[in-house]
Amino acid sequence: MKKAYVKSYGCQMNAYDAGRMADVLAAEGYSATDTVEEADVVVLNTCHIREKAAEKVYSELGRLRVLKGDRAESGQETRIVVAGCVAQAEGREILSRAPAVDVVVGPQSYHRLPDLLRQSRETRVVDTEFPAEDKFDHLPARRNRGVTGFLTVQEGCDKFCAFCVVPYTRGAEVSRSVAAVVEEARRLVEGGVREITLIGQNVNAYHGDGPDGAPATLGQLMDALSAVPGLLRLRYTTSHPNDFADDLIAAHATNPLVMPYLHLPVQSGSDRILHAMNRRHTGDAYRRLIERIRNARPDIALSSDFIVGFPGETDADFAETLRLVSDIGFSAAFSFKYSPRAGTPAAEREDAVPEAVKTERLAALQDLLDRQRHAYNAASVGTLTEILVEKTGRHPGQVAGKTPHLQAVQFDAPASTIGTVVPVRITRAGSNSLFGEALEGAAAAA
């Protein structure tokens, strides 16, 4: 049987897309492999959000060129595919920089992958069009991959933040219909998935057709999903502060499947920098939004994204970011040094922050965020929480799962608990996960 190796870089949507590409190849007779050396088709599903991520792809392609040559010497064919956002952004340039690549395919065209592979036997192929047809209508049924799963409900972004390539690589905001999302969710649950994370570049801008043909909100979509038998938990990511509707806030209080966790990027605490980033909100507007969300769900865990060293950022601007972090308190966060991306407005600016200053600011921010994360996890010790068991743990007799607040937890229980919710008393907080004990009889009953 032919074998396919699919590697994904970057965001959760890339992980979803990588899985769907594996499904497309499986329908063509390819079995999945984790060993690139034995693959007949190698797919790199790429991320273009930062320069470092893009350069990783070219480094990997250099290694794959050698592998392709070695396999050819033994009479084995290898097709190399570059997919995702680097493919969309750089197109034919990839063929120039990486001679071993056979197919370049953008994120809106990967349902065509089998045809592109066939075409590549005659000539190298680039497909970075935004086709009129909905790719989701052309994808095969999803295969079961575990207890949790991603489900794309929205793609693209209309916000045009000054630092971001997503509007150029993923296109304008489009949403799938409620019926299509519910049907895919139903199939996932039938395959064993118990927790679904709804994903989109700007997921709370969701506006897919509802049952009556009118645009539905993300809150309404989650209400519809809560009726899927066997579905236990719902999450969503990534959101924009400007698209947080009242009914989405209310869903955190009224829909029992919506978990008390929210990833809501803010990027900076400085109003001056937020304006330069074209974020269209202020630091205080973000604070007020968080206050409203916490009023609806007081125990909600918050995470965010931050960029340090955006062009023109001063010490005073950075101090405002630290103040916002201190004011709000996060359970987790992702923080990065600004990386210019060709074609974005910020890349044209001439007031770059020195690399050494970026490094210093990132270290200070991450120190504060790490202290908040450790304090948040330490506060969980002694509490009783419900763990959705996802897999076996690191040690024999151990399983691992997540709290409603998306904290990783390990505890002793049989593998038969995988896919069930087990009440667990948290006994210890480690550096990256929590440890606990299942309530007596709970694990056995599961």
Curated annotation (Swiss-Prot):
Q: Where does [4Fe-4S] cluster 2 bind?
A: 157, 161, 164
Which intervals hold domain TRAM? 378-440
Which class of enzymes does this protein belong to? transferase
Q: What is its EC number?
A: 2.8.4.3
Cofactor(s) listed:
[4Fe-4S] cluster
Could you tell me which residue ranges the Radical SAM core domain spans?
143-375
Keyword annotations of the record? 4Fe-4S, Cytoplasm, Iron, Iron-sulfur, Metal-binding, S-adenosyl-L-methionine, Transferase, tRNA processing
Binding residue positions for [4Fe-4S] cluster 1: 11, 47, 85
UniProt family annotation: Belongs to the methylthiotransferase family. MiaB subfamily.
Name of the featured protein: tRNA-2-methylthio-N(6)-dimethylallyladenosine synthase
User: What organism does this protein naturally occur in?
Assistant: Methylorubrum extorquens (strain CM4 / NCIMB 13688)
